[in-house]
Amino acid sequence: MHEESCDELQFQHKIDTMPDEIANENDGNVLHLSQASSKCVEDDIQQYINGYPDQEDDLMRNENYKFFMDEIPSRPNGDYIDTIHNEWWGDYKRLEDNRKYMQWLFPVRAKSCNRQAQELFPHEIKKICDCKEAQDRLLLSYKMMLDFYGLKLENKKDGTVVRSDNWEERFANLNRSKHNHNRITRILKCLGELGFEHLKKNFIKFILVEILETKTLVNLQESCFNYWIAILKDPSERAEMSVFYEQLTKNMSDSLT
């Protein structure tokens, strides 16, 4: 099983492996989950939005912070974060095939199948958010993965992303590789935990256009519609993206009449 598939909670793995549980609404665009899967989605989203209120902190565990400070390497088969940025960037085969580094670059509060990667604890969140060096490294990790997906960050203040020069090749890979959709879920969750919530909305907005308007990333629709929009922490941003989605689908319908 892919590491990223394990990183998602049970509902996401169920979506990945049991597509017959997903039914299309009449317009063919809005995706709906079975009742059981929908409950799992709702519970996980609420845990994330509410900041995992039942999570117990462990002040003795600091591996995520140490990794962000370039003090320890990712494990297994990994490296120090600065080395990853310097030597792995643009090595698409390595970034694709190695399934052990994402849990270190983008830690979240849930445990993963990488037993050598630590879940993110509340005290680490504060330390990473308060440290410019750690923040700069997280932003660089995000830019590296955007490049891997055929994108680049045009504006770090509002999160606007655009296609990179090799977008066609990279989009093709992203469109066909479900585990990369799960990686994006992890990235978005991590950004929201570690001080970069403001980068998420315009990334999602870009993906919606590529799904519904240009149709270059149609296979991302389940993750985007059912999850990514919902893990925007600001209710006004969730509402904005819902309106934007509805407008795109209306434009599609109008173009067919």
Feature-to-residue mapping (PLM):
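Alpha-helical bundle/repeat cores within regulatory domains of eukaryotic proteins
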Residues: 156-257
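N-terminal leader regions that mediate targeting or early regulatory function
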Residues: 1-158, 162
